[in-house]
Amino acid sequence: MDRDAVQQRLADIEIRISSVQQQIAEQRKVIVKLEGAGQAAEHAKYLLAGLELLYGAHRDNRTATLAELALSSSTAKTN
């Protein structure tokens, strides 16, 4: 994959990470609100756990993409 495509993929990943971070923050607020009202929050916590897994996957993808970008940089310098 060419460098521009990798950079675009990285930008897309950063947007996804930001979005999931916002969703996690909102879900935490929902949980606090539910628990504060004495309501069951199990489903909300389950959703939060899923969002946190998704966040981790996006972070792993970002790490791999950054490594790919670094590799393409060093390869371009040696050619």
Identify the function of each model-found stretch:
Residues 1-79:
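Anionic, Ser/Thr-rich low-complexity intrinsically disordered regions
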